[in-house]
Amino acid sequence: MSQGIEFNRLMMDMKAMQMDAMSKPKSTSAVPEVAGSNFSDMLGQAINKVNDTQQASSQLANAFEIGKSGVDLTDVMIASQKASVSFQALTQVRNKLVQAYQDIMQMPV
């Protein structure tokens, strides 16, 4: 019996949500609303992350070179490879952006 009551209450809640959704005015603007950050902010954050990775790798390598305790060669190599991969990815993004810019500039007006 309680399952029937729960089902009825669920159906009533769903109908109430449907009525609320139908009563709200719909947005008719032609320009979509942008949520979040824009592309330049995201690109800047990515560049800063790559820079931080490069600097952390360099600091770890320097610590290993001077013989600081607690710095392992495997950690240095992993950090170095992470920095290398992130820089290569950033380079590829740059290449794609330059290519897209050139394609747009070559389009006839």
UniProtKB/Swiss-Prot annotation:
It comes from the Bacteria. GO terms for molecular function: cytoskeletal motor activity; structural molecule activity. One of its GO terms (biological process) is bacterial-type flagellum-dependent cell motility. It is found in: Bacterial flagellum basal body. Keywords: Bacterial flagellum. GO terms for cellular component: bacterial-type flagellum basal body. InterPro entries: FliE (IPR001624). Belongs to the FliE family. This is Flagellar hook-basal body complex protein FliE. It comes from Pseudomonas fluorescens (strain Pf0-1). The lineage of its organism: Bacteria, Pseudomonadati, Pseudomonadota, Gammaproteobacteria, Pseudomonadales. The gene is fliE.
